[in-house]
A protein has these predicted regions:
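Active-site metal-binding loops of divalent metal-dependent hydrolases
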Residues: 9-11, 30, 229
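Conserved N-terminal subdomain of the carbohydrate kinase-like
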Residues: 4-5, 13-25, 40-119, 124, ...
Length: 294
């Protein structure tokens, strides 16, 4: 079915410190943030590996949501770990333990023809997953600065396979980008989303550029996962409303609203507890901000 949404990505146990204090082995990961945001709008399938030490926390976070975990593999391995220090809204990577990818043999729905997002993870695995999603009507991917820097050829392979690509300004520069529209054409992308934190974001397509401001009137406690939550909200909203070019601005607004809910709390707490009604209220705030800046 072309109306299905799937995310393939990471499940993580994060240890981070920043203005919010310190959290140790709290639930995170690209697949988790994306799925929690998307499931506020429509059902979503999750493809990811998790160790025995993290499976219970994932089940608790996903409880009550329309999240299909049939392809979430629980392995006898340590869940992916990530350590970071947050400074001025930016996560400085302090290292990770990603050996779980070595024992993971991912499976996909046969001939999946819906929309798929391959979240940040070790790029060789990203590329493998994208190769398994060749029939997807829309195939999107995200990046992670540390992997772009450590594995540039594999990161570019992910970019080459993408229809839509999501990155922040640092990742864009690390991939050799200077002019976003030129970059989009160079890599034959249907769409490129460049995120600029508190400055908002811009989406580049063959129809032009669409900009949406960040919602700065709300408190910002922890920016981790904001990009994945944004992608989940944006793609779920766009797909659920038909996926036409005219609906892109609306979809971006919903994505920003999901990101705003996420960063208002530490870790996944905010987006995991959010309701559709709360999301709709946040969308109104983003729309008001957009009107003020237009």
């Amino acid at each position: 079915m072309t109306s299905e949404l799937l995310v393939a990505g990471s499940v993580a146990l994060d240890t981070r410190d920043g203005p919010f204090g310190k959290v140790r082995e709290t639930l995170g990961g690209s697949a988790v943030y994306f799925a929690l945001a998307a499931s506020l709008i429509m059902p979503v399938k999750v493809v990811a590996p998790v160790g025995l030490d993290g499976a219970k926390r994932v089940a608790q976070a996903f409880s009550g949501r329309t999240i299909d975990v049939d392809l979430l593999q629980i392995l006898d391995a340590r869940t992916y770990r990530w350590r970071a220090h947050q400074d001025h809204g930016r996560n400085i990577d302090l290292g990770s333990s990603d050996n779980i990818y070595d024992s993971w043999e991912p499976t996909m729905p046969a001939n999946f023809e819906g929309w798929a997002f391959v979240g940040s993870m070790r790029p060789d695995r990203q590329a493998q997953l994208m190769g398994m999603l060749g029939a997807a009507k829309l195939l999107a991917a995200d990046s992670m600065l540390s992997y772009v820097q450590a594995r540039p050829p594999e990161a570019r392979d992910v970019l080459r396979r993408s229809g839509w690509f999501f990155c922040n300004e640092e990742e864009f520069s690390a991939l050799g980008g200077t002019d976003p529209e030129e970059f989009r054409r160079q890599w034959w992308l249907q769409g490129l989303v460049v995120k600029a934190g508190a400055m908002g974001l811009a989406a580049y397509t063959e129809y032009g550029v669409v900009r949406v401001p960040a919602l700065t009137s709300r408190p910002i406690l922890d920016t981790t996962g904001a990009g994945d939550a944004f992608a989940g909200g944006m793609l779920a909203r766009w797909l659920s409303t038909g996926g036409l070019p005219a609906g892109l601005l609306d979809a971006l607004v919903w994505g920003v609203a999901c990101a705003s809910i996420t960063i208002s709390s530490i870790g996944v707490k905010g987006i995991a507890k959010a309701t559709h009604k709360e999301l709709e209220q946040r969308v109104v705030e983003v729309e008001e901000c957009l009107r003020r800046e237009s």
